[in-house]
Amino acid sequence: MRQNNLFSLIFWLVPVSLIIVVSAQLCSEKFGTFTPGGTFDKNRRIILSSLPSEVTAQDGFYNASIGTDPDQLYAMGMCIPGAKQKLCRDCIMDVTRQLIQTCPNQTAAIHWSGGGKTVCMARYYNQPSSRPLDLESVSIGYNVGNLSTNLTDFDRLWERLIAHMVTKASSASIKYLSFDNSRFYAADETNLTNSQMVYALMQCTPDVSPSNCNTCLKQSVDDYVGCCHGKQGGYVYRPSCIFRWDLYPFNGAFDLLTLAPPPSSQLQSPPPVTNKDEKTIHTGTIIGIVIVVAMVIIMALLALGVSVCRSRKKYQAFASETADDITTVGYLQFDIKDIEAATSNFLASNKIGQGGFGEVYKGTLSNGTEVAVKRLSRTSDQGELEFKNEVLLVAKLQHRNLVRLLGFALQGEEKILVFEFVPNKSLDYFLFGSTNPTKKGQLDWTRRYNIIGGITRGLLYLHQDSRLTIIHRDIKASNILLDADMNPKIADFGMARNFRDHQTEDSTGRVVGTFGYMPPEYVAHGQFSTKSDVYSFGVLILEIVSGRKNSSFYQMDGSVCNLVTYVWRLWNTDSSLELVDPAISGSYEKDEVTRCIHIGLLCVQENPVNRPALSTIFQMLTNSSITLNVPQPPGFFFRNRPESDTLRRGLEPDQYNNESVTCSIDNATITTLLGKTLASALCCITSTLFSKSMYRNTED
């Protein structure tokens, strides 16, 4: 048996003393090794790549298994309760990357990260979860500073606090924020003196029993005392539990705590040391102190500089649409032969859809995992840009309402994306694509309302909670996939764009998207922002309520040319419930439906400033007490573009006829350079120019 303990030491200067914060990793060969590139390794990469999104989606703790013997493995990830989702996701993403890079062939490994703004853990192993409690694998560290108070009094208070926390952590169930990952967790603070606090944190993984949690924590406390008694802080990491304490708050674990009542007696601050014989400090002592402090500051500045350079390089690789190097996500790369085997060499019967730049196949990996394989067209120049954009972008996005990228393959002219397989096809299949009423009936109002909420959460993540602000630019029913439980997942990020810090809008000469879903400022001037996605989402909300396509409404008199104009007329005549899909008539909540229609109209207002942000939309949907603004008239702008694929070709807006057609939103007469009937016809035609979805539906 051989074990490699790998520690990342981060030095930082704090007012108390020089602190050593350690992230600990253990690569163990106790249960054997595997062949790099083999089935076990591929399973490991797949399941570890899923942890960042699954841990945040499952309230801070997730465990799962993949594959079959002898290549089956188990994995888990965990963050401390109260951790913000972005911090948790980023922490898990970092530790899983470390596991893949630094444990090349071990069948069991664990990484605890406690050096940032939160604490997280990821591990994998080839033994079932019923394994015995592992107390042998341990990492211990301590603060290099010594306590300057009376140790007898300190030990009494410290032991009282720690004993209380062991009991609390092995039996308590405290809930913080939206996270329910609170089993076997305790974070507490108490007074040592009038001006000094002590902070402590304990946590066990939720898969252990209360007695094992208690045993693990007690052993960790004993190990710390035996190693590091008298120090100003320290930690003990084990595969099933962690223990840390210090004289300052750490990892954001104490942000939500109310100050604990002080113990019955406090330690008194030691009196200042005076010595009549020491009237001056030796010059050598001063020089030594200055040198030490200077070295620490230099080390900190160097670490900061390296971090800034790395983040800049990372951003540049992420932002460039024409970058040739996608090795930043190399651990997601599949061998092209494995993809060919998974799809039976792209057998026609495995084809499940037609994407905007290629075909989509259903495949089964060697470990039994079903996947969706997007094979980009070899003849599409734009497809290569889309491919790079989607790999670099989607690999960094982890959310339960986004389709998860499992990997990619790149060899010669072959450009392939591998996604999680979503079994229930796309939303448009159920809303519009089936003549079978039972299919449409599967989307009752409760499911439709949940779908609206799920899309809201996914877009909110893209706009606000991801590392960069992401504009999807092609939100529509065919790009919303439904999982086995009819939960929505936003797909097709080939057109997505990212914003820099503090950037709120951008413009492009290559307008891409789908007529009827694009806001007027984007079609007319190429301007896009988060409010562009809001407009598209508003149209989609109205489609979900009505069960009809935006382009399916047309009257030759010009009074109605699409769904938005139709809804606006209903709204102004207090008859908005006439919009509701007959398939759900009599089985919906009128207040919820009316509110969704109201929100949809707020989203499609002509002025982007008037459209609500996704965070506001989320509040509107979850808090019925919020009063909604009165919607302003929706915006309509359609150019005379005779070819169905003009938007996909990336031509400049001024290359087209600038004659515009405006649909009537009230009883006023349409006045354009075109005839009234021709204007109405063109309005309808342009609003029906839909781009192809990731999954084209070909069956009922």
Curated annotation (Swiss-Prot):
Keywords: ATP-binding, Glycoprotein, Kinase, Membrane, Nucleotide-binding, Phosphoprotein, Receptor, Repeat, Serine/threonine-protein kinase, Signal, Transferase, Transmembrane, Transmembrane helix. Its EC number is 2.7.11.-. The modification Phosphothreonine is found at T514. Residues 1-24 form the signal peptide. The modification Phosphoserine is found at S478. One of its GO terms (molecular function) is ATP binding. The chain crosses the membrane at residues 286-306. ATP binds at I352, G353, Q354, G355, G356, F357, G358, E359, V360, K374. Gene3D superfamilies: Gnk2 domain, C-X8-C-X2-C motif, Phosphorylase Kinase, domain 1, Transferase(Phosphotransferase) domain 1. This is Putative cysteine-rich receptor-like protein kinase 30. It comes from Arabidopsis thaliana.
